[in-house]
Design a protein with these regions (language model features):
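Negatively charged, low-complexity tracts enriched in Asp/Glu with abundant Ser/Thr
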Residues: 2-37
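Short linear motifs centered on Gly/Pro in flexible linkers and helix caps
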Residues: 7, 16, 72-73, 93
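Generic cytosolic/nucleocytoplasmic N-terminal low-complexity/intrinsically disordered segments
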Residues: 2, 18, 61, 85-87, ...
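Mixed-charge, Lys/Arg-enriched low-complexity segments
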Residues: 73-102
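Intrinsically disordered, low-complexity peptide-like regions
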Residues: 1, 9, 33, 71, ...
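Sequence-pattern detector for short linear motifs
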Residues: 12, 43, 68, 88-91, ...
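Acidic, low-complexity, intrinsically disordered interaction modules
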Residues: 34-78
Length: 102
């Protein structure tokens, strides 16, 4: 599938991507990989979101990564959707030294 074919299918509203096509998106074999976000961890799998770029647009595919050698990666409920980059500021707190600065 070319970038143009992907965009045409996505913009049609009914892309019907195959499992193989979704796997390629998830495994960074289609488009330009941007980021991978690891989500909630369950007993046997972890939720994963792979972000990739096609042309000047950003897309994501969510899928489940198997956490043991007996668990396969799962794409049955995978979804492909367009995303946008947003800045997010996060504050963390560290312990303050309370024993003087000798």
């Amino acid at each position: 599938m070319t970038n143009e074919e992907f965009l045409q299918r996505y913009d049609s509203g009914k892309p019907n991507f195959t499992k193989d096509e979704i796997e390629k998106m998830a495994y960074e074999e289609f488009g330009n990989w941007v980021d991978t976000a690891e989500g909630r961890t369950h007993r046997w799998y972890q939720e994963v979101e792979t972000i990739f770029e096609v042309g000047d647009r950003l897309f994501a595919v969510n899928w489940d990564r198997g956490l043991t050698e007996q668990q396969e990666n799962d794409f049955d409920d995978a979804e492909v959707y367009e995303v946008e980059r947003k800045e997010k500021v996060i504050f963390t707190y560290i312990r303050k030294d309370t024993y003087g600065n000798d």
